[in-house]
């Protein structure tokens, strides 16, 4: 039997994402919501998402140490002068997590991660786990990843990037058909299903960079929202006896 941990990442990155994630939870597929503390829309996330029933969904901190888009930037909650290895000369996070290789100070990164934990908790979210935005530690800085695993342990949280992920699904064309093919490749096991739902909205126009053209994020994230809100998606998973679980159940 296959068990999925469906996770909606980037809550707090935009109001369009916050509204879409709430809709996806109502659709019955999303069971975990990862919150980004640095972007301004985290305040909106508290209004839109905080009252969701934790018997149905759990919240985690999406530890955010980079700002990947050219059209919108964010920086640390900590005073940038206290975490110089994390910021550029404008006080923003670096764009690509690979830029932190050989540069990042793990103590500074932990100070910022703790500040992010404090912020989302102060907004009223009960956290069950943490994970890493764009795999900053798990993919690029192993010593940071180990430090975040230890931080999670100290805080009584599950580190949600230690399980194998479901490989990404192409979000163009017939997304439901692609989704079914991908799930069909895994008759059993436990996988994290990373998602980034959002409404197609002008708010996402700044989400572009040298690798991601303007408009792509809005189109793809809206396609993912529609997949996750489609009643056929949940029904098909149930027919295959795919279990959908929260990290809080671990």
Language-model region placement:
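Short histidine/acidic/glycine/proline-rich micro-motifs that form metal-
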Residues: 134-139
